[in-house]
Amino acid sequence: MRKIISLIHLSLDGFAAGPNDELDWIAYDEELEQDAHALHALTDAVIWGRRTYEGMASYWLTVPGNPASTPAELAHARWLDDATKIVVSRTLERIDWNDAHNTVLIKENIAEEINKIKQQPGKDIWFLGSTMLAQTFMQLDLIDEYRININPTVLGRGKPLFAGVTREIPLKLLESKTFKSGVVALRYEPNRT
């Protein structure tokens, strides 16, 4: 069965974004970029919420035509174009990503629909949703691997990752590593025993 792998950056005080969705505090460098791009080999699909999808589409669809795009950006844009894009939204009517042949819109029955997708052949699925969607997926026990990058920054306020989670989620540490930037990468799986 395919796994859902969540990659989320957190501030030291537990925020996944600033109060206005700012992400400029992430200590993103070449080393973190390479770590994120390693997920390309493991995954062939991505899950987004509506707002994340809209932001990704507005940026990544322009990358191939932008002469200032870096090789890493071009590689990620190609991966996104080839990947199945799964968008969870009650308000979207359709997904417009190039020819949209590899898109799935989930409007209801999230757990049932995601579990159907996990049963289909393919590589693992990269979860890049918002904090609200992440909390929903955590509540429904849909995330199979948590990759949490703790950044050496205290935001003081913002969008907390775990605020809407009301159940205990025991985790087993699979790996931890420290990057030169001071980011500590933690990789967990739910301890479902």
Predicted regions and their residues:
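Portal/gating segments that form or line small-molecule/metal binding sites
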Residues: 1-142, 152-193
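Short, conserved catalytic or interaction motifs in soluble domains
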Residues: 145
